Amino acid sequence: MSKESKDNKDDSPAPAGLDKRDWIAGLERGVSIIEAFDDANPRLTASQAGQRTNMTRTAARRYLLTLQHMGYVASDGKLFWLTPRVLRLGRSYLESARLPRVVQPFLQRVAAGTNEIAYLSVMDGDEVVYIARNGPNRSMSTGYVLGARVPAQVTASGMLMLALRSDAELNEWLATRQLTVFTSHTIASMERMKLELARIRAQGWALSEQQLDLNSRGIAVPLRDRHGTLVGALNITMPMGHESSEDAVARVLPVLRETAQAMRNLI
């Protein structure tokens, strides 16, 4: 059988724990085509899409043309790019998931108590995704938009959720990742990262300053459900201004902690 024929059959192995009969490889490949586009690769040829998804050019082209017919992809005949219709997929999550809706009144409480933008964020792979936010009107045009994805290693919420992983999960992450440097303040060595994550785990909250953007500060606390399971992080981002780290923590941390505790029995 040719590689092209294989690419168009659902014959790839199912993930561990999923019966082969319940696995639709074509759906997995279609999603992987959408995920092949990113900041560094906003437009792709069929060959490039195939290389990024481990498909042949012919198979990638068929998925791209199918997505184009569905309205998720546009093309000039050579290059392909995502259309705004893709945002419907993320919007479906934000509108159907219970957590972003439940958290809104509490984010409003944090924003009112701190005069800063408050967020709920979750982990997806090595990134933090912001799934809810609330803040003063003067600030809502700044900060992270809903659905924004940021490397976990440089955010307070991301470092917090990394620190609260099991020892095995955290050690695996530390052993298999490379740190990206964004500013002169970014933690660039795994030894220093390991020490910082240990400190965060011990104190139960995280502070990150100027690791992704200069003059930006983040403070985060864990958000747990009634069973104690970590479901995300409640966090504030703010410009550093003239407020010291100690003063910012003293002002914001109690509000974050009280709000996270109040939410615990509702999620």
What are the roles of these predicted feature ranges?
Residues 2-11, 139-212:
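Short, solvent-exposed recognition segments
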Residues 2-101, 261-266:
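N-terminal helix-turn-helix
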Residues 82-177:
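Amphipathic alpha-helical effector-binding/dimerization core
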Residues 214-215, 231-267:
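Juxtadomain coupling helices with adjacent low-complexity linkers
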Residues 223-226:
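Sensor-regulatory modules in signal-transduction proteins
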